[in-house]
From Swiss-Prot:
InterPro entries: APS_kinase, P-loop_NTPase. Catalyzes the synthesis of activated sulfate. Its EC number is 2.7.1.25. The keyword rRNA processing does not apply. This is Adenylyl-sulfate kinase. The gene is cysC. Pathway: Sulfur metabolism; hydrogen sulfide biosynthesis; sulfite from sulfate: step 2/3. It comes from the Bacteria. It comes from Shewanella halifaxensis (strain HAW-EB4). Gene3D superfamilies: P-loop containing nucleotide triphosphate hydrolases.
Length: 205
C-alpha cells in the first residue's frame, strides 16, 4: 500500500456540486423488508429527477446483480455488501450527486461505518419505521412466510434483530399517510437544509 497514493484532481467535489446547482448528499433509507424503503426512495428520486436534479438510487437487490453478486447473506457478507455500497456512494457524492440508498442495514454499527465515510451533514439517515406487522402483511416477496417456515435463516425482524436508529435525521412510517405526502415531506427537508433549490423545485411542480 505504500506505493499507492491519492491523486488530487483539479476539479473537486464543490466544483461538481456548483455545476449541478445542488448539495451532494447521501440519503440512507433503512428499515425492515417490506417497510417501503425502495418505494419511497424511488418516488423521491423521480420527483428530484423530474425537477432537474442529478441523482442516483442504489437499491439493495440491484447491487447484488453486479457489484455484490459474489456475496451471500452471512453476517460477514452482509457487512461487506454495505461496505462496498458505502464506498460507491462516497464516489457518487464526490461526483456531486444526490444519492439515495435503500438497504435494510440492520445494525447501528453498519450504518455508522457508512456515515463515517462522509463529511458532516452529507449522510442523512432516513428510518423507514413501518411496523413489522404491516411489513409482514405486505410481504411483497413472500420472504416473511419463508422465514416463519424456517426456510430463510437470519431473517431480519424474525430470526435476526433490527437495531432501530437512535439518531436518524428523518423517521417515516409508510403505513401512515400517502406516498405523495411522504415524498413532499422529504423534499421540504432537503430544501430546508439547502440540498436543493426550492425555487427550482416549485417551477417543476
Amino acid at each position: 500500500m505504500s506505493d499507492i497514493v491519492w491523486h488530487q484532481h483539479s476539479i473537486d467535489k464543490q466544483s461538481r456540486a456548483d455545476q449541478k446547482g445542488q448539495k451532494p448528499i447521501l440519503l440512507w433509507f433503512t428499515g425492515l423488508s417490506g417497510s417501503g424503503k425502495s418505494t419511497l426512495a424511488g418516488a423521491l428520486e423521480r420527483a428530484l429527477f423530474d425537477a432537474g436534479f442529478h441523482t442516483y438510487l442504489l437499491d439493495g437487490d440491484n447491487v447484488r446483480h453486479g457489484l455484490c453478486k459474489d456475496l451471500g447473506f452471512s453476517l460477514d457478507d452482509r457487512d461487506e455488501n454495505l461496505r462496498r455500497v458505502g464506498e460507491v456512494a462516497k464516489l457518487m457524492v464526490d461526483a456531486g450527486l444526490v444519492v439515495l440508498s435503500a438497504f435494510i442495514s440492520p445494525t447501528r454499527a453498519e450504518r455508522e461505518r457508512v456515515r463515517a465515510l462522509f463529511d458532516d451533514g452529507q449522510f442523512i439517515e432516513v428510518h423507514v419505521s413501518t411496523p413489522i406487522e404491516v411489513c409482514e402483511a405486505r410481504d411483497p416477496k413472500g420472504l416473511y412466510s419463508k422465514a416463519r417456515a424456517g426456510e430463510i435463516k437470519n431473517f431480519t425482524g424474525i430470526s435476526a434483530s433490527y437495531e432501530v436508529p437512535t439518531a436518524a435525521e428523518l423517521i417515516i412510517d409508510t403505513s401512515k399517510g400517502d406516498l405523495a405526502t411522504q415524498v413532499s415531506a422529504l423534499l421540504d427537508y432537503l430544501a430546508a437544509i439547502q440540498v436543493i433549490d426550492s425555487e427550482k423545485l416549485k417551477k417543476a411542480i
